[in-house]
Amino acid sequence: MKKLMVIFMCLVMCVSFVGCNNTEKQNDEAKETLQRVLEKEQTFTAKTIVFSDKTTEQTLEKYHFQTIDNAYYSFVPEQYAFVDMDNDNIDELVILDVKITYYLVLHYENEKVYGYNIGARSLIDLRTDGSFMTSSAGGISSIGNMCFDGSECKVINKALANDYDQEYFIDGKKTDQKTSKKYFDDWNENTSKISWVTIK
């Protein structure tokens, strides 16, 4: 019986080791590809009009987009950070245009790079674990991570506070203001802000 247990434990350790090595290899491949985009050597797929279904091949050097109110932005990459935005152990590349306070999140999937432009209030206080805060003019704040599917990305809220309507949620379940505030305070104190690297 002991011998069987030892064999079983060895098999579990081997599978875990292979799994870790495979994820590390995928992360290295993703970062190498994203680095080529950063160095303007490779294109990425992105929407040039927010809320449109159409995508085009872009280069970081000439990346531009149009918002829902038809404002036109020519994106100027100034700072970047590698961070796992969707908790799959594979890093995304987040690039910041300081002047217009817009972010470009680059995600590697199935040998392609996809880009998503994110406004300032939709990506506040990005943390090393990929979590971030969002805020709206209506007194609604949330903490969440991103989820990617090809050219689409969405925010998965871990916590949401609607002070205007006095509604509070943690992991999709309703809670009270005190518990919600503690969650936001704990997140603020116990997670680390990312360190941006200046693009030279």
Regions found by a protein language model. Give the residues of each.
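Positively charged n-region of N-terminal signal peptides that target proteins for export
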Residues: M1-F8
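C-terminal motif of bacterial Sec signal peptides marking the signal peptidase cleavage site
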Residues: S16-G19
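Acidic, small-residue rich beta-repeat scaffolds with periodic aromatic anchors
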Residues: N22-I49, M133-K200
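Blade-edge motifs of beta-propeller repeat domains
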Residues: Q26-F75, K112-S122
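Beta-propeller blade termini
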Residues: V76-M85, S122-S131
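Acidic/hydrophobic-patterned starts of short beta strands in beta-sheet-rich repeat architectures
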Residues: N87-L96, T128-T134
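Beta-propeller blade repeat segments, especially FG-GAP/WD-type strand-to-loop junctions
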Residues: Y102-Y116, M146-F148
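A short, surface-exposed interaction/processing loop segment used at functional sites
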Residues: E109-G130, K154-E167
